[in-house]
A protein has these predicted regions:
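Short, glycine-/small- and polar/acidic-enriched structural segments
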Residues: 1-146, 150-156, 169-173, 178-179
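Predominant activation on well-ordered alpha-helical scaffold segments within soluble catalytic domains
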Residues: 16, 62, 116, 160-163, ...
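Transmembrane helix-loop junction
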Residues: 26, 117, 121, 161-164, ...
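Short amphipathic alpha-helical segments at helix boundaries and their inter-helical linkers
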Residues: 51-54, 145, 150, 243-257, ...
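Pocket-lining segment of extracytoplasmic ligand-binding domains
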Residues: 59-60, 138-230
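Ligand-binding clefts/hinges and TM-proximal coupling segments of bilobed small-molecule sensing domains
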Residues: 109-125, 129, 205-238, 280-282, ...
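Secondary-structure end/capping motifs
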Residues: 193-276
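Conserved C-terminal helix/tail region of periplasmic/extracytoplasmic solute-binding proteins
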Residues: 263-301
Length: 301
């Protein structure tokens, strides 16, 4: 089985750990894990049959499904905004952001959506700042250090590195409690229907991977460091703490409200999206079957 992941970010650690801890193999799956940068590319790879499942961004799944494909979320990884807003040293309060430059990766992506949401929650209209597309998190941080940017939306471990440079964490969005289906494990309805035993092994392995992630910090950190290509273990520890403790659920259900939020956003360009049921974007039958058996609860006893 070929499984993809769409970014080298801490949000994708559970799928790396499931592979590296040997949990796919334990459940009888021979898995080749492939990095496929970007949600749209990952969706296309799934539709072409090159991969059978992908850990990827929610907006890409919703967009693909709205276009008529059968891609669905079979598990949730990040069901809320996990991002943090960092600012240069001189900015310590939200109102100081007015008229300033805020960096995201690309317009329309999860970080861009999150940045605009965060600004509104802080009482600032997105039109009151200049939002710039600057690519990867490391590029955004470099732009801040060079004085070309005043704030950026990032994830650990970049947050830890920024704080070392004297920058501020103005807002930790994980504390807002907003439901947005930022990332999850996606597959196709066709694959699930034709290969349900293999799909069940996949979801069982993934649930065990999350348990490993949450309960075996040292081993998980080593895997995260490998995939993120870093030796900065302080930053890796911050990544583990943020996602394993605050973000990733023991029972990784995608949320209907989180997907509805994405549909509402999509409706700005595709009005028909407002009438689409979030349940169309999910297939939780595998996870529910596993959960109903008591398997997940037993892992944590």
């Amino acid at each position: 089985m070929h499984i993809g992941y769409s970014a080298q970010a801490g949000a994708f650690a559970p799928i790396w750990i499931t592979k590296e801890a040997g949990l796919f193999k334990k459940n009888g799956l021979d898995v080749n894990l492939i990095f496929i940068p970007g949600g749209p590319t990952a969706a296309a790879s799934m539709l072409a049959g090159e991969v059978q499942a992908v850990a990827m961004a929610g907006p890409a799944v919703v967009s693909s499904n709205l276009a008529g494909t059968d891609l669905v979320m079979i598990a949730g990884i990040v069901n809320t905004f996990a991002f943090q807003i960092i600012t240069v040293k001189a900015i310590t309060a939200p109102q100081q952001l007015k008229g300033k430059r805020v960096g995201v990766n690309r317009f329309g992506t999860a970080p861009d959506i999150a940045a605009r949401f965060a600004l509104r929650r802080m009482g600032i209209g997105p039109s009151e700042v200049t939002i710039l597309q600057l690519g990867e998190q490391s590029t955004r941080l470099a732009a801040m250090k060079a004085g070309q940017l005043d704030a950026a939306i990032v994830l650990p471990p970049i947050t830890t590195i920024a704080e070392r440079e004297g920058m501020n964490v103005l807002l930790d969005m994980s504390e807002l409690g907003a439901e947005y289906q930022i990332t999850g494990l996606a597959s196709s309805q066709a694959f699930i229907a034709k290969n349900r035993p293999a799909a069940m092994k996949l979801i069982r392995s993934f649930v065990e991977g999350i348990h490993f992630y949450k309960t075996r910090k040292k081993e998980s950190m080593a895997i995260i460091a490998k995939y993120m290509r870093t030796n900065d273990m302080e930053a890796v520890a911050a990544t583990w703490d943020h996602f394993a403790n605050k973000i990733v659920p023991k029972k990784p259900y995608p949320t209907a409200r989180g997907i509805k939020a994405l549909l509402d956003l999509a409706a700005k360009e595709r009005p028909e999206a407002a009438k689409v049921s979030p349940e169309r974007m999910m297939n939780i039958s595998l996870l529910k079957e596993l959960d109903d058996s008591g398997f997940i609860d037993a892992l944590y006893k």
